Amino acid sequence: MTPPPARRSRRTDGDSAAPRLALPRRGSVRRSQMITTYGVGSLIAVDNESFVVSGIDDAHRSWALDEAPIIHEHRLARVLGVKHFRLPPASEDTSKDGVRVRRFPLWHSCPSCQCLQHIRDFNPPTNKNVCTDCDDEPLVPSRFVVACEDGHLDDFPYWKWLHRKNREDGATGRCGGQMSMRFSGRSASLRSVIISCTCGVPEVSMEGSFRRSALTDLGVRCEGRRPWLKGAPAEFCRQAPRTLQRGSSSVWQPVLKSALSIPPWSDGLAAKLSEHWETLRSFSSRMEIEIYLKGAFRGDDSVTADAVMELLAAEQEEDPDRESNADAGAVSPYQVLRRQEYERLCSGNALRDKGREEQFICEPPVSNPAVLEPFGVARPMLVKRLREVRALKAFTRIADAESSSESHEAALSLTPTDWLPAMEVSGEGVFVRLDESWLDEWAESPAVAARVEQLRTNHDRMLQERATDPAEAPVSPATPRLVLLHTLAHVLINEWSLDAGYPAAALRERLYTDDTMAGFLIYTATSDSAGSLGGVVAQGEPDRLAEALHSALRRATWCSADPLCIEAGTSGIGGANRAACHACAMLPETSCEYNNILLDRALLVGTPEDPSVGFFRQVLTA
């Protein structure tokens, strides 16, 4: 990872398009972390230095195409309003560029002389982070930064914090003194972080700086700065600034959107047509398409007018805006994507009907699924090959993406781009669908409705507390159907982690649940093009799936934390769980779509006082 220098020559030698000098390499991270952990706008610590990952405005110059190839997922791109996606660059040691970073925070302290000031006042040599007055002692970046819920980021206002009652003669921070930071060592709390100034003001500690209104009470407002965007002007902002630890997860949280590649977009043809799609879409007749294809794909018989017409028809049929309007705006575009995937997972897509480039292979098992009828499970589907694209749409600060509206999402670039950074992963999985008539009958039980209503109320309260404006807070998706399917997916992943050879962290859930959907996909997905070796698909054969379900449900009847767990009125973050804990139903966070909330194993197996709330109670008592 490399920071952009203040002045960079774009002159070239001969025919080479590369700069004369390679930029200094600051460190490296895994490619997937550029989407999930160290994406645009995040802070990354490298040795004794700290940087913010730059925006993608200049990525067309710094991300080489051979290191950061273009990938396509038509359905997701259309919803996100872009043409394509790009993988973060996988740079070699000889690469002259890559993901750019910028130094942040700019305030540093010297552990030797305890001086606290802007890094430029230390006068360090170029590309070094040292105190020249202390024999090149490495400087320490500020532990504290300031952020707001609109995504702005700034240095902590140390001068204003220290001179809170003595700012008449130095309101702009020019009191003539030299600030310093020291640690008293009396405790590990903020009370031990002492700020002082040679101008004579009383020294203060950092205690209280993390209060929600601590900076607002001092008259400090958000300056609207976006240091990850080169040349970005400050924005007017009404949000209250908040103090955060530089390494806190609240400083940066990704807004990720994903989609599976499904027919007719999954056979490689859509990728070939991507550069020509806008032109093809403008044609009104088959003859125009045929003439264009003869010129654009001369000698390539795989691209036919019939195939293009099929894709054009599919695009119109799958238009999220069209379906949302049909449902009176009640369905989000992302839910439309899920419905399309659900329909394809239910219908299947056999390998024998497709070529080697097909990225979605979904077939029913060969054996009779009658053994699953007592569980209320419809015919499972074996997803022998899948491709998922996960795109970084934006990011949030302080409030998580779940409880934030789009108005609080921070952009990845100063000007809109026609692409977003993304990862593509390949894998396999098993799709499980429950009988909807059984679900509807079970969900009508007053006891079931009461348990879920309490969970939903707690989740709604949590979302409103986290939201800047409670009126804009999203509504909890908790329903009996969702909580049941979510908890079942969790216990089944835990069971398969013991039987399929994959750790729970290597498996993921993808839930399909609303009034018309009742299923989930458990899959393994890796960045390797080969995906995995069939161990998960084998678990979807009816006999093995029945055994796994029975074993998982038996395990769910007892938890090492019982009776506290099963009798808990509420548990988890914000009380958004009921009978669920790390000993029975929770998973690694990377495996769960809802961050380990909206879980209740009592809906699977019942409680000692009321077994009837369990959907699978008859299987367990048989």
Regions found by a protein language model. Give the residues of each.
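Extended, well-ordered protein cores
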Residues: 2-162, 178-184, 191, 219, ...
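Covalent nucleotidyltransferase core used to form phosphodiester bonds in nucleic acids
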Residues: 162-173
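Extended charged low-complexity segments that act as oligomerization/scaffolding linkers
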Residues: 183, 187, 193-196, 201-209
